[in-house]
Amino acid sequence: VLEHVGLNPTRTGVLAILRAMGADIAVTNERDVGGEPVGDLRVRAAPLRGIRIPEDQVPLAIDEFPALFVAAACAEGETVLTGAEELRVKESDRIQVMADGLATLGVAAQPTPDGIVIRGGPPGGGRIASHGDHRIAMSFAIAALRAGGPIDIDDCANVDTSFPGFAALAAGSGLDIRVEG
């Protein structure tokens, strides 16, 4: 159970997309804290399937797409994202950087001008360039949970700035993670 998760409706696209992919996610204990909706998430293992992500969900999950790309890599079949050209002008070109990283791990990922096509397959290991993008670094750390080999991620110093304690939380979730340098 993940406790006290923000559930602002302008930010919950990630839940809708994961559920459409087959994820078993239930929201419990919904409440308002400081005027914002929060709740607890119960997540159970479930096979994911590739989908065409509805464009109306893009603005509701724009910052979560690197993690969703990892979910797509672990899904059965093809996931198609369109209408997400904004991802090209974030801290990095998240479409290209994620496509390159997934390819390094042996996952078929074809970038398009406004999105990406990912064919699910088990990720392997490799060295990933995060390009200093905290969301890229954290997403590939998550990928290590399913990878067939170790994943080394370069240029991760800003992760602790945006998500203090990420490495400790990830380790507590079963990830074999080491921060070097």
Residues covered by each model-derived region:
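Short, structured segments at the rim of ligand-binding sites
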Residues: 1-181
